[in-house]
Amino acid sequence: MFKNRFFNTMQIQNQVQLKPFNTLSLDVTASHYTKVKSIEDIEEALAFAKEHELNVLVLSGGSNMLLPQQINALVIHLDIQGIDVLSEDQDFIRVKVGAGQVWHDFVLYTTKQNWFGLQNLALIPGLVGASPVQNIGAYGVEVGEFIESVQVYDRLLKQTGSISAADCHFSYRHSIFKDDPARYIITHVTFKLLKQANLKLNYGDLKQAVGDNLTAENLQNQVIHIRQSKLPDPKEYPNVGSFFKNPIVNTQEFERLIAQFSTIPHYPQANGNVKIAAGWLIDQAGWKGKQLGVVGMFHKQALVLVNYANASLADVKKTYQAVQHDVEQRFQIMLEPEPVLYNNLGLIENHTE
C-alpha cells in the first residue's frame, strides 16, 4: 500500500491519475506526484527525486504534452501564484507573475487593468509558466514580445536565476527552454506591458471582427469569439490546441508550392522565408473532420487533434502520423507536432523515434 510522504510544505503522492491534468484527457498514472507552491517546494521535490533516483517531469497546464499510460518518475505540478507590479511609468508597466497562474485569467486581468499587449493571446490554454517555453502566439502576436525576463530554478547550478528575454532566444514556437528542457524550472515570468493601447489587427479576420470599436476589451472579446467558434473546448472535446506547427519554407520551396497550389495561405517572414498554414494543408489532404478510430482532426479546425473516446497515446500517434504521411505525400512537407512527447520514464522523446 502506498503512503503519502510529507515534507515541510510539500506532499509526495504515489500512483496518481493525471487524466484531469492533461487537456488531451489521456489516461495516465504517475508513480510519484507533488504540487509545488514555492521555490522551497521545488528544492524539496528535486531532493526527493535525487534520493530515489527518479527523473523529473514538470507539469504546467498539461495543454502541450503527450503522456504514456504509466510514468515512472516524479511529476512536479507547478502551482506558484501571484501577480505583482514591480514598477511603472507613463508608457510601461512591469509585472511579475507566478508560473501557476492560469494564462487566460491573467490576460483578462491585464485588460481590466488597462494594460495592453496580450489581448490577442486570450483563451490560449495552459499556465503562465508554460508561455515562454514555446513562445505562445496567436493572431499576429507572440508572448516573447512582451516578456522582459523569466525567473527560473536552475537545476544545473542548483540556484534561482533570471534570464532576460534576449537570452531566451525567442523564435516561432521556440526558446532556450525547449533546447535544454531538463535544466530550468520556470517559477515566474516578468512582463513589460503597454499602458497605451496599440492594437494588432493585421491577422486574418480580426480587423473586420473588431470593426470601429478599437478598444482592447473589444479586441480581446473578438479573439475569444473567433477562438470559440473554431476551436473545441477541451472539456467537451479533449485536445491540445493547435497540434502541428505552421511549417516555414524557404523562397525556392514556396515558389514550388505557389505554382502548384495558387490559393495556399501564406505569411512572409522577416528573414525572407514564408510561413504556410498547416490547417489548410491538413484540410486539403482530406483530414478535416476525419477520424482514425477514436482520434481525429476537428471538423471546424483541421489543425486541432481531438480525443473522441478514451484514446491512448498509441491511438494519438497512429492518427497524427497518418496525417503527417498524407500531407507529405501531397505537398512534400513534413508537419512537426507542437506538443511535447514523453516516455514512461518521464523523459522527452523525439516524435520521429
UniProtKB/Swiss-Prot annotation:
Keyword NADP: yes
UniProt keyword Transcription, yes or no: no
Name of this protein: UDP-N-acetylenolpyruvoylglucosamine reductase
Species for this entry: Acinetobacter baumannii (strain AYE)
GO biological process terms, semicolon-separated: cell division; cell wall organization; peptidoglycan biosynthetic process; regulation of cell shape
Cell compartment(s), UniProt: Cytoplasm
Signal peptide (UniProt feature, chain positions): none
Active site: R173, S242, E338
Highest taxon in the source lineage: Bacteria
Keyword annotations from UniProtKB, A to Z: Cell cycle, Cell division, Cell shape, Cell wall biogenesis/degradation, Cytoplasm, FAD, Flavoprotein, NADP, Oxidoreductase, Peptidoglycan synthesis
Catalysed reactions, semicolon-separated: UDP-N-acetyl-alpha-D-muramate + NADP(+) = UDP-N-acetyl-3-O-(1-carboxyvinyl)-alpha-D-glucosamine + NADPH + H(+)
UniProt-listed PROSITE patterns: FAD_PCMH (PS51387)
Pfam families reported in the protein's UniProt record: FAD_binding_4, MurB_C
Domain FAD-binding PCMH-type: start-end pairs: 26-196
Pathway listed: Cell wall biogenesis; peptidoglycan biosynthesis
Cofactor(s) it depends on: FAD
